[in-house]
Amino acid sequence: MSRTVFCQNLNKEAEGLGFQLYPGEIGKRIFDNISKEAWTIWQKKQTMLINEKKMNMMNVDDRAFLEAAMVAYLFEGKEPEIEGYVPPSK
């Protein structure tokens, strides 16, 4: 049976992640409070951000920017700024 969490991003009970996908304290926080559905949505936005801003994941500054955008999106509900992208209305 899969575990459920109260997803802070979607504000509902949903299936949790199978294991901690991100290292450290932020990873633990994501594992405990973010659903599989919300993580999948974030991964799509993350890909758009990386491509739009031509980020290099070997660059420390790019990784720090992406981590800040991830925390802002998952826990504060802030949409990342992706040029030309209009989020679907709820």
From Swiss-Prot:
Q: What does the entry list under GO cellular component?
A: cytosol
Q: Which GO terms describe its molecular function?
A: iron ion binding
Biological processes, Gene Ontology terms: cellular response to oxidative stress
> Has keyword Iron?
yes
Gene3D superfamilies xrefs: Fe(II) trafficking protein YggX
Supply the alphabetized keyword list: Iron
Please explain the role this protein plays, according to its UniProt record.
Could be a mediator in iron transactions between iron acquisition and iron-requiring processes, such as synthesis and/or repair of Fe-S clusters in biosynthetic enzymes.
Which family is it part of? Belongs to the Fe(2+)-trafficking protein family.
* Matches recorded under PANTHER family: FE(2+)-TRAFFICKING PROTEIN-RELATED
List, alphabetically, the NCBIfam families matched: PRK05408.1 (NF003817)
This chain's protein is named: Probable Fe(2+)-trafficking protein
Give the species this sequence originates from. Answer: Colwellia psychrerythraea (strain 34H / ATCC BAA-681) (Vibrio psychroerythus)
Query: From which lineage does this chain's organism come?
Result: Bacteria, Pseudomonadati, Pseudomonadota, Gammaproteobacteria, Alteromonadales
